[in-house]
Regions:
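Membrane-engaging insertion elements
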Residues: 242-314, 318-319
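Conserved aromatic-histidine-acidic binding/catalytic patches
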Residues: 137, 155, 291, 392, ...
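Amphipathic alpha-helical protein-interaction segments
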Residues: 1-210, 304-306
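Residues that form ligand- and interface-recognition hot spots within folded domains
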Residues: 153-157, 163-165, 171-174, 180-185, ...
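Acidic, Ser/Thr-rich intrinsically disordered and amphipathic helical segments
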Residues: 31, 60, 71, 75, ...
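Lipolytic serine-hydrolase domain surface
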Residues: 287, 294-297, 302-391, 398-402, ...
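Serine-dependent carboxylesterase/thioesterase catalytic core
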Residues: 211-271, 378, 382-499
Length: 562
């Protein structure tokens, strides 16, 4: 960092969190920050426990992961320390600050009532509050503190998955509802885009002549936003981000229908791209014209992936229950292969052979059929109807997952935390993507993942590798009534299990949700996506639209409802 940049940062932080907080409160914030960091680091290390068979490899990967985290942590500590004037009064106070007093204050105060929402329940469960005297602050002060910390984190010129996990812990510890953080994220994203648009519209010659003068003001702007908010100043708050990192942070603003070739790095010269068709991102906000309006941009990105198709609308339709809190995209990939699979599955479940065979399957249970290859002869005779489309989709999903991973590594989403949701072969694609991120030692990019009806193994090693690259929630959704998935997977390595029909065990912090009561067949996932996300108490879903989805295009099921 140059001396000029250091001078800018020092000037910027003269009017930051130190304005909002008293010296004692600044000590509390610094202490809380360090405890949250230690908590997140411990969560990361849980993915690499002592029971791993290959301890040398596990230790090596753990070192990669924690090295990335520690570098991010150092940046955060530096920024927070500068914002609260750490080198002056706080440095002395931290050593003698009574930790037991923090706990006692937390027990004695009356917390602000949480919003009675499912998302807040998950916030408390997944990111339990850390005792701190800061939760005794007046409500408006806590609101300013949370917003100020969000803006301080953005001074890193990125908003990583770890940054968001940190803010989730902070929100919980300040005893604020999740909606407060989400509203802050939306407001900041819109202001950044608005400011960037205004800048890009100014005269180029004027920009060049003024660049040296305004660059310094811009860098001060966001750094001082917390103090500026207190003082009622509204201009130039997004300045340093706009000046240095708006392109990288909000890189996904041009995601739209971008195809793979223009956004890949290491794979650009490989043959994998040529083997995958129709790889593009489609905005869920404006699916007709794919225009992303200024007000639709967010600090977080969600990519939703369908796993089979009946019509091309199935690329987008299952996902309309995703809310406005994130910038949502559907991945268009291998339309022809997925449509072929969808048609084949529909043909199978309507066939006489399937209707007769499923009774026998049910009587034996899925697991015994898999373990002993006890599939009805009539069903095996028509297996070729499904086996070829299944094999093609399996192969293409694995390749498309590698491409998605490369796109993520090359920041197609910008420097923003990413959520991935997929069912059937969409889940297989995510599996391949996460494995690739793991193999390439890319951590801190993915915030949360939901995989539904996954044609992927349930073995511990595979899920530990995925767990290590997902900073937040990793969810396996399965149904023991998914007989089609069981039948399709019979030629694969069934000794490793099937995640789509059973829970994942012996892996820390992998959530399992059984949906056998509402998913009575593989074709059902598309119809009840919103209901499943609601069962998960997923953040950022549109509850008003979920009831409508339940009546959407009801398809044939593997098994008739009881």
């Amino acid at each position: 960092m140059s001396s000029e940049e250091n001078h800018v940062r020092e000037d910027a932080h003269q009017h930051t969190l130190s304005v909002i907080l008293s010296p004692e409160e600044r000590v509390g914030l610094f202490s809380l920050t360090t405890v949250i960091m230690a908590t997140i680091r411990a969560r990361i290390l849980e993915s690499f426990d002592d029971n791993d068979t290959n301890k040398k490899t596990s230790t090596e990967i753990s070192d990669y992961c924690t090295e990335y985290f520690d570098n991010w942590q150092d940046g955060v500590i530096e920024i927070v320390g500068a914002a609260i004037n750490y080198r002056s009064d706080v440095a002395l106070e931290v050593e003698r600050f009574p930790t037991d007093r923090v706990v006692q204050v937390s027990k004695d105060i009356q917390p602000v009532a949480y919003h009675d929402t499912a998302a807040d329940e998950v916030l408390l469960t997944e990111y339990p509050p850390i005792p701190t005297l800061l939760c005794a602050l007046p409500n408006n002060k806590r609101l300013l503190l949370l917003e100020g910390m969000l803006l301080q984190l953005l001074l890193l010129n990125k908003y990583t998955a770890y940054s968001r996990i940190f803010l989730l812990y902070l929100t919980s510890s300040l005893q604020l509802p999740l909606s407060v953080l989400v509203d802050d994220e939306i407001r900041v994203a819109q202001y950044l885009i608005k400011t960037a648009k205004l800048m890009s519209g100014s005269n180029e010659l004027e920009k060049r002549s003024e660049s040296n003068k305004i660059s310094r003001r811009w860098k001060i702007g966001l750094a001082g936003v917390a103090g500026a908010t207190v003082m009622g100043v509204t201009g130039g708050l997004a300045a340093p981000l706009v000046a240095g990192a708006i392109g990288s942070l909000m890189g996904g603003i041009g995601l739209g229908t971008t195809a793979a070739a223009g956004l890949l790095g290491a794979l650009a010269e490989s043959g994998i791209i040529a083997e995958v068709n129709d790889f593009a991102f489609l905005s869920l906000k404006n699916p007709t014209n794919q225009t992303i309006m200024q007000g639709d941009h967010r600090l977080r990105v969600t990519i939703a992936i369908s796993g089979w198709l009946v019509t091309e609308e199935d690329i987008i339709n299952p996902w309309f229950t995703l809310g406005h809190q994130s910038e949502n995209f559907a991945l268009r990939w291998e339309v022809e292969a997925l449509a072929s699979l969808g048609t084949a599955m529909q043909s199978l479940v309507k066939s006489t052979a399937w209707n007769l065979a499923k009774k026998e399957i049910i009587s034996q249970t899925v697991f015994s059929s898999l373990a002993h290859a006890l599939w009805p002869m009539a069903l095996l005779k028509i297996a070729k109807v499904l086996d070829n489309p299944f094999s093609v989709c399996m192969n293409r999903a694995d390749k498309a997952g590698v491409i998605l991973a490369d796109a993520i590594i090359n920041r197609v989403q910008g420097e923003r935390p990413l959520t991935l949701i997929g069912y059937s072969f969409g889940a297989r694609l995510i599996y391949s993507c996460l494995k690739t991120l793991f193999e390439r030692r890319e951590f801190g990019l993915v915030e949360s993942v939901v995989m539904l009806g996954s044609p992927v193994p349930s073995d511990v090693a595979a899920w530990k590798s995925m767990r290590s690259v997902v900073a937040g929630r990793l969810v396996n959704v399965y149904s023991t009534h998914d007989y089609i998935l069981s039948f399709l997977y019979r030629t694969s390595k069934i000794q490793y299990g099937i995640a789509g029909i059973q829970p994942i065990t012996s892996v820390n912090r992998v959530e399992n949700l059984e949906v056998s009561d509402i998913v009575n067949g593989h074709l059902k996932y598309r119809d009840v996506m919103g209901t499943i996300l609601q069962k998960l108490k997923w953040e950022g879903i549109d509850h008003d639209k979920i009831a409508n989805q339940n009546g959407y295009s009801v398809l044939y099921s593997d098994v008739k409802p009881e």
